[in-house]
Design a protein with these regions (language model features):
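Alpha-helix initiation and N-capping motif
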Residues: 16-19, 58, 71, 90, ...
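Amphipathic alpha-helical packing elements
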Residues: 35-79
């Protein structure tokens, strides 16, 4: 289902994949525009993985975003409040997240999600990010490690 105002997990905010999507979900939820089936997973799944990388509790990020902070302001605040990650740290984070579901511990979950979403025959969906984009009716991004 297409959700206006919700970015792809591939989209990057100041060098980090997924972060902007997490903030979009917070803002959409705050405005009452986030579909109900997303509510139970707020702060869980990839959100939880993201906040663990940042070293800032999800609830604190929610409160910061609710105060009107932009993406850049929120990431600056997270880096001040939480973990002082380096560019190599961000590269490892991005590659881990971007490939999640491709030959790793999340592969079975991806297979299950594809079946639930009616995408079992879509061989080009190789990662969880691919699945999210397909499920939200976005074109898939290139997967250079498969070329």
């Amino acid at each position: 289902m297409k959700i206006p105002g919700l970015r792809s997990p591939h989209d990057i905010v100041r060098g980090l994949h997924y972060f902007g999507r997490m903030l979009d979900k917070i803002r959409l939820h705050q405005r009452g525009e986030l579909p109900a089936d997303f509510h139970s997973n707020l702060g869980e799944g990839f959100d939880k993985t993201c906040v663990q990388f940042l070293g800032v509790p999800y609830a604190e990020i929610v409160e910061h975003v609710k105060g009107g902070a932009s993406d850049d302001e929120t990431l600056t605040w997270c880096r001040w409040r939480g973990r002082q990650f380096t560019e190599p740290d961000a590269t490892v984070w991005n590659e881990f997240m971007r490939k999640r579901g491709w030959n790793d511990a999340a592969s079975e979950r991806l297979k299950q999600r594809k079946a639930e979403g009616g995408f079992s025959s879509r061989e080009e969906i190789q990662t969880m990010f691919d699945y999210i984009d397909a499920d939200e009716e976005r074109p898939l991004r290139a997967q250079p490690w498969l070329i």
